[in-house]
């Protein structure tokens, strides 16, 4: 049964057994040698020597998520352009025209986002009408 197993399989099996043994040894030594503090503050969160104050839940503005989504969208599109730039000689003029149309669509999308105010970090200030209506 063990004669038909190749040397590579034996080496992998020894590696897996060794990795599991090292993990179990470290967990066992930590359990044996680790300190056992009992008291009120055992279950209290500890962060870099500073006692925690307040809640851990923070509210983030939706602008953070919008910026992250825009980054992902334009980053993926940059990857498409990188793939095109690698094969620019093989794609010829047809590929160049397609890439130009693609870049144009990206610019149209960017202008649209800019026009609707999605890229502005602070809210728009209301415009005051200074017309005298006497």
From Swiss-Prot:
The keyword Transport applies. Pfam families: Oxidored_q4 (PF00507). It catalyses: a quinone + NADH + 5 H(+)(in) = a quinol + NAD(+) + 4 H(+)(out). Keywords: Cell inner membrane, Cell membrane, Membrane, NAD, Quinone, Translocase, Transmembrane, Transmembrane helix, Transport, Ubiquinone. Its EC number is 7.1.1.-. GO terms for molecular function: NADH dehydrogenase (ubiquinone) activity; NADH:ubiquinone reductase (non-electrogenic) activity; quinone binding. Belongs to the complex I subunit 3 family. NDH-1 shuttles electrons from NADH, via FMN and iron-sulfur (Fe-S) centers, to quinones in the respiratory chain. The immediate electron acceptor for the enzyme in this species is believed to be ubiquinone. Couples the redox reaction to proton translocation (for every two electrons transferred, four hydrogen ions are translocated across the cytoplasmic membrane), and thus conserves the redox energy in a proton gradient. It is a multi-pass membrane protein. Disulfide bonds: none annotated. It is found in: Cell inner membrane. It comes from the Bacteria. This is NADH-quinone oxidoreductase subunit A. The chain crosses the membrane at residues 12-32, 64-84, 93-113. NDH-1 is composed of 13 different subunits. Subunits NuoA, H, J, K, L, M, N constitute the membrane sector of the complex. GO terms for cellular component: plasma membrane; respiratory chain complex I.
């Amino acid at each position: 049964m063990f004669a038909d197993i190749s040397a590579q399989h034996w080496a992998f099996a020894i590696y897996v057994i060794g990795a599991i043994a090292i993990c179990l040894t470290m967990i066992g030594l930590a359990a044996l040698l680790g300190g056992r503090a009992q008291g009120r503050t055992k279950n209290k969160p500890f962060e870099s020597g500073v006692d925690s104050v307040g809640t851990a839940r923070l509210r983030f503005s939706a602008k953070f998520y919008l910026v992250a989504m825009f980054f992902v969208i334009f980053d993926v599109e940059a990857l498409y352009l990188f793939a095109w730039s690698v094969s620019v000689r093989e794609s010829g003029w047809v590929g160049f025209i397609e890439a130009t149309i693609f870049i144009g669509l990206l610019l149209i999308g960017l202008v649209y986002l800019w026009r609707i105010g999605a890229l502005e970090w602070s809210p728009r200030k209301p415009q005051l009408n200074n017309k005298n209506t006497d």
